[in-house]
Amino acid sequence: MSVSAFNRRWAAVILEALTRHGVRHICIAPGSRSTPLTLAAAENSAFIHHTHFDERGLGHLALGLAKVSKQPVAVIVTSGTAVANLYPALIEAGLTGEKLILLTADRPPELIDCGANQAIRQPGMFASHPTHSISLPRPTQDISARWLVSTIDHALGTLHAGGVHINCPFAEPLYGEMDDTGLSWQQRLGDWWQDDKPWLREAPRLESEKQRDWFFWRQKRGVVVAGRMSAEEGKKVALWAQTLGWPLIGDVLSQTGQPLPCADLWLGNAKATSELQQAQIVVQLGSSLTGKRLLQWQASCEPEEYWIVDDIEGRLDPAHHRGRRLIANIADWLELHPAEKRQPWCIEIPRLAEQAMQAVIARRDAFGEAQLAHRISDYLPEQGQLFVGNSLVVRLIDALSQLPAGYPVYSNRGASGIDGLLSTAAGVQRASGKPTLAIVGDLSALYDLNALALLRQVSAPLVLIVVNNNGGQIFSLLPTPKSERERFYLMPQNVHFEHAAAMFELKYHRPQNWQELETALADAWRTPTTTVIEMVVNDTDGAQTLQQLLAQVSHL
């Protein structure tokens, strides 16, 4: 009997089972213990293969692929700390709903806790973060292929969002020629190999039903809060709110067109919050709200009913309102709850939104990050998409810009970490094939610098704007101790990215004004390559501009 041959047959069943659940993209890191999984994936023509040498970046690449494809994406890594590097991407997927399938190779049980090399306790290492965790046994013909495939099917068939961890121990030898070992074991699955359906099919999840009193609530004074959603959902939500005559507070990730722009500015005005107090119902569609003033208002508002609609399960309301948690696809929910044409009830807020935008426009000429955030809608590629980093940049875009309705916007706003942002952007571009504008800060770029290797392989133009404000200037907005702020919070690195771009043979520009930036962008959109544009700005200008605008708008 050939151990290596049966390892590969066992792995082939696992990989084939994944294809029955929509897995097309598979991300592979180098490793020896994962050889059976890697070779099985390589031999399966249903997969699009992606590789990367850094498992943390690989997990985020898969996250980006899953964001766009809306399908589960598989990841293969070897044993040891390689597995632990997948933790950040798994956590993010659990909070934002992408489906990741982590296939982690492992040493067999007799090599654990005895000093064997690269052998750690992998079963259960991700605690409660996966939706399902499976610790497979060592491959053996004593366990039927039916058990193996139905175990995989059960986990994936009930997966609605988040990750599945499948731990796969393999004994040596891992290499060798294929022979007939395990062929009859594999063939007991019969014509399943020629089929395209799962061996075990789970019943679909039940979603929230139509709210029978909707006809009553839609006649009341309501507010729509739009969080993270798809581009198509964003357009539908905007029309729905407009028909109802309800004010729409749109997050940067809502893709609604933000008909009342600069919400995180005007929500700091007492006239706005006073008018919003008249709302009898708030309907929040989508989660992961960004703006600080929006979150403060959301926490303090007291409508008669607060409804949250999202297809991600869980509470999704840190303010714990009295109301309804409705688990449903947003577009489907809107169809079940049609709008009735009514006149807008808010008078003051549209005026404040217009005045706030005019205040922002009055400051747009200076070459800085706040101004870039406002101008970003002018720089979006046609038929393209935007990927926004975390910390200060996403808050500035949320507060100061007005993105087009239905224009795809992606970000990692679940756990809101700055790790893996470039890798996620690479996955977003690969899955869509669209021109992509990605914007991150300098520390975020440094954190995921080796992901520039992934950006060498793009199918359409990708522009990475690195806003270099020399450190974590988000902390300039917080009451951090002034004497310790630079050393322990901002951590300026005093670096530039020209040589990093050169190391990975990427185009690079460092514009000094808007004309140079626009020229660099126009050139970048002409060729299907990656261009790094480093925008060096004064350290605290972005944070100070936001604070000044907040003060100005609060007194309108």
UniProtKB/Swiss-Prot annotation:
It is an enzyme of class 2 (transferase). GO terms for molecular function: 2-succinyl-5-enolpyruvyl-6-hydroxy-3-cyclohexene-1-carboxylic-acid synthase activity; magnesium ion binding; manganese ion binding; thiamine pyrophosphate binding. Its EC number is 2.2.1.9. Gene3D superfamilies: 3.40.50.970, TPP-binding domain. GO terms for biological process: menaquinone biosynthetic process. Its cofactor is Mg(2+); Mn(2+); thiamine diphosphate. Binds 1 thiamine pyrophosphate per subunit. The keyword Cell inner membrane does not apply. It catalyses: isochorismate + 2-oxoglutarate + H(+) = 5-enolpyruvoyl-6-hydroxy-2-succinyl-cyclohex-3-ene-1-carboxylate + CO2. Catalyzes the thiamine diphosphate-dependent decarboxylation of 2-oxoglutarate and the subsequent addition of the resulting succinic semialdehyde-thiamine pyrophosphate anion to isochorismate to yield 2-succinyl-5-enolpyruvyl-6-hydroxy-3-cyclohexene-1-carboxylate (SEPHCHC). This is 2-succinyl-5-enolpyruvyl-6-hydroxy-3-cyclohexene-1-carboxylate synthase. It comes from Escherichia fergusonii (strain ATCC 35469 / DSM 13698 / CCUG 18766 / IAM 14443 / JCM 21226 / LMG 7866 / NBRC 102419 / NCTC 12128 / CDC 0568-73).
